[in-house]
């Protein structure tokens, strides 16, 4: 018997046992492609073996078992399983919410108890499904005397995605209506995704976090399937952005047909959504019950429940957008049906996008300063046009502007189209569109000169609008529906003028700030000129020295010169400015060639401490000389100078009396310019 005849025999036997699903079961067996020997074995095998194969196929395809007298019992299934001594179960999908059974790996020599955690997660749920679990253990010899391989497996790491894609033709519409797959629970027919790794740790393809896929239980059939089993099937790839099949795709592109909304029962759709939510929650709880599973920490793939919910939310959002567009058209036209859209009770999900841009829902009000209305009055007045969200009027003594925020942007368009003025409590109120700070287009920016500095970000009022109203908004509102181009030009012209005024104001502010900076600089200079010089003032010391030398003998002046010269000689390394200041300050004569005006330092930034030190040292003995002259005379003055230097009195820079040489051999008179011969004065 060849493979063709064996296939015909197997198909006839399957059709006799399950006529409803015979074609699908036979197609599944042919897809497995296990060779001619397996088909001949099924054709001549016992009926219990064929029942196990059919149960296996039903389980893979998600079909309900046919109830009839031919359904085998668990004893027959066990006998069929005992036909092969070597039993190695294949990985299969199971039903959610049931506990996995341990793998039975048996051999003729060892019949040890099976381990608890196994690579087979076949499910036994009652006596009617025990034969399904035993059917997983069907094996047959491969290539003669080689090791046994599963009938449905071959390679245990077979790609299940390719298998499910090959099964897609079994769910086409070409099958008779009587053989259509009825509505069933989606959670019991789809393969577990990555999130179900807690229950299915070693399933085929799931250990790598692969997505669950079951073409026989598509999302379109679960969510939108009709009573006849056909239903509308929106293309999920097209909803994501691209479908490679194009117009040849067997799913619907671009939404549902027009009559779909009428046929869909809203209560049934809502009930399906609730079922999906409950089922997905139970799956997450089941996955959390096994935290040490190899795939328990992997992210779950999008399940059928998530896809169905996102599809329903997308359709609801499209319906809300169409209703909102119809409401805007009715409000703009002012027809009889406008009152239907005035008071929508709550915000839809799509309205949050408009809330992100509050400028589209706000208007700017200007009114006289002597107005007496309150925020409640403004809210009550504008609630005629639509629901008001907020009213803000600054708390000022002379208030002249305010802001009104509406719930929907269509209300703002309706009020602006009506035009001005509005009267609230006998006060004339002008309505203007709310505009945020922005930039003028490039074609208007080119009108300014290149050298002109313009700052478009600044504005005269908190809203960027001037209090004046050069254009009548009533005419603008009338033209918005008829001549949109002219209205846009008018708005752009007004915006340009406002920003020009803002630029002029900015220039005036900068000019005023520059003037203030100039005044501050002048004030700073005057204060700096009036402040005392930080360096030591030589005039007081010089005048004291001049007064003292009038009473001292000439030798005391020579001694002062000599001591000052010695100090300058020892400190010559410190700079020429110190040497000159020391030499000049140590000459207390009133001669014309030794003027006091030469006591100025070379640098105006000299250190005040050093200059003060050198200004005090030459005159310290002079003060002692003044006190000594009144009591003892000139001779005591010399002794006082030497003793004061040797005892380390007031001046520690002077050398001791033993080391001090005679001052006269070291004194060299130098000619100086008098003050009247080019000396620099203050």
UniProtKB/Swiss-Prot annotation:
Single Gene Ontology MF annotation: RNA binding
Keyword Metal-binding part of the UniProt annotation: yes
InterPro entries hit by this protein: AtC3H46-like_PABC-like, AtC3H46-like_RRM, Nucleotide-bd_a/b_plait_sf, RBD_domain_sf, RRM_dom, Znf_CCCH, Znf_CCCH_sf
PROSITE patterns, A to Z: RRM, ZF_C3H1
SUPFAM superfamilies in UniProt: CCCH zinc finger, RNA-binding domain, RBD
Composition bias type Polar residues, residue spans: 539-550, 583-593
Coiled-coil residue windows: 485-521
Biased composition (Basic and acidic residues): 441-455
Ranges of compositional bias, category Low complexity: 100-110
Gene3D superfamilies reported for this sequence: 3.30.70.330, Zinc finger, CCCH-type (4.10.1000.10)
Membrane-spanning segments: none
SMART domains from the UniProt entry: RRM, ZnF_C3H1
Keyword Transcription: no
Ranges annotated as C3H1-type zinc finger: 229-256
Sequence ranges assigned to domain RRM in this UniProt record: 361-437
Pfam families per record: PABC_AtC3H46, RRM_1, zf-CCCH
Keyword entries, A-Z: Coiled coil, DNA-binding, Metal-binding, RNA-binding, Zinc, Zinc-finger
Renumbered residue ranges of the record's region Disordered: 91-111, 441-460, 535-616
PANTHER family per UniProt: RNA-BINDING (RRM/RBD/RNP MOTIFS), RNA-BINDING (RRM_RBD_RNP MOTIFS) FAMILY PROTEIN-RELATED
Protein name: Zinc finger CCCH domain-containing protein 53
